Amino acid sequence: NFGAPELGVAGAAYASVVSQVAGALISILCFFRLYGRIHISINLGKDGYSQYCMMLLPVVLSELFWSMGQSVNTYVYGHMGTNELAGMSLTGAVQGLTIGALSGLSQAAGIIIGKRLGSNEYDKAYDESQKLCGLGLIGSLILSLLLILVRNQYVQLFRVSGDVRTIGAKVLVVFAILMPVKVQNMIIGGGILKSGGKTRYVMMIDMMGTWLIGVPLALLTGLYFRLPIVWVYFIFSQEELVR
């Protein structure tokens, strides 16, 4: 640690904040180096503000209600037991890593398809959206297979009980099975549809999937029927299929 004091969990929190601030500063610096000085104005006109809000508000609400849904799921895990919550937390890092590895396709879809639509090249936009979905499917299948193969080695990296490792390994299998569906939703909903301005449509899909299917299933299976955590995770994740 190069002579620095051991901070434990607080140190991890400090490191996260510092890394995020550093990343933001680097992005701002690169932006100004590429484009020089820019003139910032918030005067969009009446029609501009209206259109901006119509596009932005559904995105904000969608992310807000999705985050609230994830909080409810965590609440369910916590009330099922310490091992269950620890097992789910164990998989968080690798889930974020694998989804993050393919999130670039969603961002690329938003840029590429948006550019084609802006140029009125609708046929090319459709063809390229299919190609991006295909790449996402292939990539997610490969990562799913790798994740299933190394799941036991991954959980062995943590100093936890055998029960927690068992739960974590099983949850990773379920996540790997559902990953292709998650990635397709990410590319189509988060990239293709939003690039076409269908933000309200995406918001409705996300809210219905989360609050009409995912959250009720999590509450029923986890708190009422008291099913094992692996089955709870598998059942409420079927919201991805509905989306």
Model-based region annotation:
Residues 93, 207-216:
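Small-residue-enriched core segments of transmembrane alpha-helices in multipass membrane transport
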Residues 8, 83-84, 199-200, 228-229:
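Membrane-helix interface segments
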Residues 4-57, 113-178, 221-243:
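Short alpha-helical transmembrane segments in multi-pass integral membrane proteins
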Residues 74, 85-151, 183-202:
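Small-residue-rich hydrophobic transmembrane alpha-helices
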